[in-house]
């Protein structure tokens, strides 16, 4: 069989479809991002995703199963020990999990913070605890403006987040201290991501995070993107993809300010007509709505993405394949503010794909990476079981 010319892989960040068997171990029993959201609001009609088979994967009020899905469809488990962006995306490109990324539920050790301050030339930091990003700038933003000390916080994920005022502290200075933190937080600390979280405003009533977030990830081992690039193909990264992989295996990268901007950038990448992989992350579902438990905001974002799908599909050539998937769950109806341990959907569509094929429940997100490798005719990483033969015409 001839190789596919292009794969357009869109990660709709945090769109889970039901609790995994071990969800209770993570405090996530009964989580179902799409199912619970649809039920709570009395329906969530996603006709275009439904036509691809989304409603066949879990009960979504308003998006029923269809008898003849237009694409191949299935669900994937997260094999790795985690439920965060890094874990999901790294597994998806065939990176076999080693030790889990470390989390710091009690904040970071004092000696580590002291070394960070020494290297970064800081008198001190504020916070150093688990917190919501929007709440901690309300709590500590005014003190940050008085002292000039950045706000350090973490979450249930393996993240070292640094919030600072974009104008008073300075965006480039914020990026500089985050690069210093990234260098410090390598193994044995093994923090997955250092995240710069700039904000603006004058007091706690109007502090607002800006779109100039920047992620600094651990350096990944060899993975799918390297294989695609080394085969002479393009890897066009949209959104935070380049940050997640520290730029490895990427030939072109563009950051985005919103889902709508991300969809526009996907169109621009499609218009480039370069053979290879377009790899996009649309983060608003997770960042703006999942963590904030905003059911209506999340639902609106899903409706907008569903409405945008036909125009993307219309730009697919006869040798192109569209893949829609997610990296973890983040049920906006659930208690707390953290990600949820869920299965994620995988929907594949295009002229090379057999319609109506149920690929079942995959043991790992790496199965998708192995499948993309086979479709593009590049070597697999050795982690993940390809289902390309099931779905290719």
From Swiss-Prot:
**Residues involved in Mn(2+) 2 binding:** 286, 291, 339
Q: Report the co-factor binding details.
A: Binds 2 manganese ions.
Which cofactor is recorded for it?
Mn(2+)
EC number in record: 5.4.2.7
Pathway involvement of the protein, from the record = Carbohydrate degradation; 2-deoxy-D-ribose 1-phosphate degradation; D-glyceraldehyde 3-phosphate and acetaldehyde from 2-deoxy-alpha-D-ribose 1-phosphate: step 1/2
GO terms assigned for molecular function: magnesium ion binding; manganese ion binding; phosphopentomutase activity
Query: Where's it found, cell-wise?
Result: Cytoplasm
- Spell out the Pfam families in the cross-references: Metalloenzyme
Query: Its GO CC terms?
Result: cytosol
Which keywords does this Swiss-Prot/TrEMBL entry list? Cytoplasm, Isomerase, Manganese, Metal-binding
Supply the SUPFAM superfamilies for this chain: Alkaline phosphatase-like, DeoB insert domain-like
Task: Give, as one word, the top-level EC class.
Answer: isomerase
Sorted alphabetically, which Gene3D superfamilies does this protein's record hold?
Alkaline Phosphatase, subunit A, Phosphopentomutase
User: GO terms for biological process?
Assistant: 2-deoxyribose 1-phosphate catabolic process; 5-phosphoribose 1-diphosphate biosynthetic process; metabolic compound salvage; nucleotide metabolic process
| Annotated coiled-coil segments of the chain | none
Q: Which residues bind Mn(2+) 1?
A: 13, 327-328
**Catalytic activity line of the entry:** 2-deoxy-alpha-D-ribose 1-phosphate = 2-deoxy-D-ribose 5-phosphate; alpha-D-ribose 1-phosphate = D-ribose 5-phosphate
CDD domains per UniProt: PPM
Role of this protein: Isomerase that catalyzes the conversion of deoxy-ribose 1-phosphate (dRib-1-P) and ribose 1-phosphate (Rib-1-P) to deoxy-ribose 5-phosphate (dRib-5-P) and ribose 5-phosphate (Rib-5-P), respectively.
Tell me what this protein is called: Phosphopentomutase
Annotated organism of origin: Symbiobacterium thermophilum (strain DSM 24528 / JCM 14929 / IAM 14863 / T)
